[in-house]
Amino acid sequence: MKTPLAPTKSNLAYVRDQLGLARDGYRLLEQKREILFMELTSLLEEVHLLETELDKRRKQAYASLWQLLLAQGRDDIAACALVTPVPCRVQQEVLLIAGLRFLRLDAVMQPPKLQYAALGSSACMDRAREDFGLLLQTLTRMASVQTIVWRLASEMRKTQRRVNALSKQIIPQMCETCMYIESVLEERDRESTFVLKSLKARKDPTTTL
C-alpha cells in the first residue's frame, strides 16, 4: 500500500481485512489460471490433431477436384455448381470455461436439394462435393477452436498479470504496512507501560521499573 496510514488499531484492522481479501483473491486467481492452463493445453492438442486432419482433407478434396476436372471438364463442373447449392448448417455450442463464455461452431453438411445427374455428372461429382464438405467442416472446427484458444491465451495473460501484481506488489506492501503499524503500536504500548511504572514508582519508591 503506497499511501501511508496512521498507525492506529482501526487502520491495522482495516489493513488486515484487506490483506485477507487480497490473499483470497490470489488463491482464486491461481485456481482460475490453472483451469485456463489445463483447458488451453487440451485445446492446443486438439488444434494439432485438426491441423493433421485439415492437411489430409485438403489433399483429398483437391485430388477429387482434379479427378472431376479430368472426367467432366471445367464447363460441366461450372454448370452443375450454378444449379446445385450445397446446404450447410452451422451448429453452435456454448462452452463455459473458468466463468467465461465461448461459442464453439460446427458446420453440418446436408444433401443437396437438386440432383444433377441429368446434367451429365458422374460419381466424381458426388465424391468431390463430399470431400469439400468434409474440408469445410474441418475448417470451421479449426477456426472455432483457434478463436477459443486465442481468447483463453489472452485471458490467461491477464490473469497472470493480476497474480503477479498481488504476489509481488500488493500483498507484500500490505504485509509491510501491517508490520509497520504493529511495531509502532507495540512501541507505544511499551512507552505507556514504562510511563505507568514511572508514575507508580514516584508514588511508591519500592516499585521496580
Curated annotation (Swiss-Prot):
UniProt-listed Pfam families: ATP-synt_D
Keywords, in A-Z order: ATP synthesis, Hydrogen ion transport, Ion transport, Transport
GO terms, biological process: proton motive force-driven plasma membrane ATP synthesis
Molecular functions per Gene Ontology: ATP binding; proton-transporting ATP synthase activity, rotational mechanism; proton-transporting ATPase activity, rotational mechanism
Source organism, top-level taxon: Bacteria
Family of this protein: Belongs to the V-ATPase D subunit family.
PANTHER family the record matches: V-TYPE ATP SYNTHASE SUBUNIT D (PTHR11671)
Function: Produces ATP from ADP in the presence of a proton gradient across the membrane.
NCBIfam families: V_ATPase_subD
Identification of the protein by name: V-type ATP synthase subunit D 2
UniProt lineage: Bacteria, Pseudomonadati, Spirochaetota, Spirochaetia, Spirochaetales
